[in-house]
A protein has these predicted regions:
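Nucleotidyltransferase catalytic core that binds NTPs
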Residues: 48-285
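Accessory beta->alpha helical hairpin/"wing" motif in late/C-terminal subdomains of nucleic-acid enzymes
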Residues: 31-35
Length: 285
């Protein structure tokens, strides 16, 4: 086993300007390629110096104290929600899915139902960031109502530390893939080093992603980073209906055309009811 090392870098010493016009940033809050090279050089230098000094130190990922407080508060709320399921304390195999459900389809239902058979308890974190066609409240309701019969499944808001503009802004830039950031490191490190241990999650489930480059890369990164913490990443094949892979993007295109007959093939009645409320079918006809 290699020695572990805790490395702290002061970005102010790397870049004294620290503003969006500086060479350090390519966008506000995200460093440029050149900055990455500088940081890598700083890290390598520290590793070499620490090795030469022979210090035994701990290399670990840490988040800022103010965010740590917010994360702890979120996790405490999640734990309280989970305890509403009386059987949860008996479960020794816990899995999780983080999903957007924009909108909730038979494909999402299939992924959840399949995963629920592979663990005692399954946590579904619905992406809370309101950057989708359907607001969080509607998406959360779709998932809640569409999985009500699955007794070992608990539906939860994702908070600001799972697939959010704070942890993985590129997820919400899919319409401009050439501009999207594929940097999911922060998101996955928070999950593997804070969220999963706190909630005793040992498996994370994802659906195969044949279309979306951002999500596909996210799944690949997940297998590497979560694997380092002995968290199994299980990829489940996508559901097909009439030889068509069920995906939310297609449903949204059907909604633009008000093709309700086609939509009915791919979404549960619980989702259909919410869609009709949202799009006010009576007025559109």
């Amino acid at each position: 086993m290699p020695d572990e090392m805790n490395i702290h870098l002061d970005w102010n010493k790397v870049d004294k300007k620290m503003n969006k016009r500086s060479w350090y940033w390519d966008t506000p809050g995200h460093c440029s390629n050149y900055a990455c090279k500088v940081i890598a050089g700083e890290i390598v230098e520290k590793i070499i110096l620490e090795k030469k000094c022979g210090k035994k130190v701990n290399r670990a990922f840490e988040i800022e104290e103010k965010n740590k407080i917010k994360l702890d508060d979120y996790l405490n709320k999640v734990k309280n929600s989970i305890l509403n399921n009386k059987n949860w304390k008996k479960y020794n195999s816990i899995g999780a899915i983080v999903m957007n459900c924009n909108p909730f389809t038979y494909g999402h239902r299939y992924l959840i139902e399949t995963a629920s058979r592979l663990v005692n308890g399954l946590l579904i974190f619905v992406v809370e960031e309101d950057k989708s066609v359907f607001p969080f409240e509607e998406r959360y309701r779709m998932v809640k109502e569409g999985t009500r019969d699955l007794k070992n499944v608990v539906i939860l808001p994702s908070g600001k530390f799972m697939i959010s503009t704070v942890t993985f802004a590129g997820y919400f830039q899919k319409d401009n893939p050439e501009k999207a950031s594929y940097d999911s490191f922060y998101d996955l490190k928070i999950f593997s080093e804070y969220i999963a241990p706190a909630l005793k999650i040992k498996k994370r489930f994802v659906g195969e992603e044949p279309f979306d480059k951002v999500t596909s890369q996210y799944n690949k990164d997940m297998k590497i980073l979560l694997g380092e913490k002995d968290i199994d990443v299980i990829e489940i094949p996508r559901l097909k209906i009439d030889d068509t892979v069920v995906n939310a993007t297609y449903i949204r295109k059907c909604l633009e055309k008000k093709d309700w007959r086609e939509i009915t093939k791919y979404v549960p009645v619980t989702t259909m009811n919410i869609l009709q409320e949202s799009f006010d079918v009576n007025k559109s006809e």
